[in-house]
A protein has these predicted regions:
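Short, flexible loop segments at the rims of nucleotide/cofactor-binding pockets, characterized by
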Residues: 25-29, 48-51, 84-87, 148
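Short beta->alpha connector loops
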Residues: 28-31, 52-57, 176
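Active-site-adjacent beta->alpha loops and helix N-cap segments on the catalytic face
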Residues: 56-67
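Short, glycine/serine-rich, charged loops/turns that create anion-binding
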Residues: 1, 29, 56, 78, ...
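Amphipathic helical "hinge" segments at domain boundaries
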Residues: 1-48, 125, 129
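Short acidic active-site motifs
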Residues: 33-37, 59-60, 152, 156
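Bacterial carbohydrate/catabolite-sensing allosteric modules
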Residues: 10-20, 42, 65-73, 77-188
Length: 188
């Protein structure tokens, strides 16, 4: 995704200025691969691990707790671990609250699995709470789920538009899925 690309570029720049090299492993959001790489990197001569994870499972927590090298998690808040993250709930709350009064009609939401605490659970709950604080309830029939990809945003928006052609606004959990939804809207 664009955000992960920017994160890794920034980390690479800082590490390079300090004389470090970065080894990068792409896991495609597959939890088992993340765990395999955590094990691989901590058992080889690395100075630290930066993990951009979507879902933190019990296995992740155990691997993080037993890691023998410093580890920093990006994008998730895990108790007892060094983490860099933003407030997904509040950001989505502000979006939901700001929409009411600016958008007339049906407001929809395309999210991701709620196993991802930040992008899935917190963003959806924040969006719903922001709408509710302004007096609007998010209709469950106007909620779809994607999988972080442009194509999944496209498919979810197409499905939504087929079911509810008069939807006025579609909020998406990620920029990448929003790009797919925009493509579907452009074709509608």
């Amino acid at each position: 995704s664009e955000s992960v690309s920017r994160i890794t570029a920034g980390i690479g720049q800082v590490l390079g200025r300090r004389g470090y090299q970065m080894l990068l492993a792409n896991t495609d959001n597959v939890a088992e691969r993340e765990l395999e790489y955590l094990d691989l990197f901590q058992n080889h001569p690395v100075d630290g691990i930066v993990l951009v994870a979507t879902m933190i499972t019990d296995e992740h927590r155990a691997a993080i707790a037993s890691c023998r090298v410093p580890i920093v998690l990006i994008g998730q808040n895990v108790e007892g671990a060094a983490c860099v993250y933003h407030d997904d709930y509040e950001a989505a709350y502000e979006l939901g609250h700001a929409l009411v009064g600016r958008v007339e009609g049906k407001i929809a939401y395309i999210g991701v699995t709620e196993e991802d605490r930040a992008a899935g659970y917190d963003r959806r709950r924040g969006f719903e709470a922001g709408l509710l604080a302004a007096g609007v309830v998010l209709d469950p029939h106007l909620v779809r789920r994607g999988s972080f990809t442009l194509d999944s945003g496209y498919r979810a928006a197409r499905e939504l538009l087929a079911d509810v052609p008069d939807v006025s606004f579609i909020a998406c959990a990620t920029d990448t899925m929003a790009a797919g939804a925009l493509r579907a809207l452009d074709e509608a």
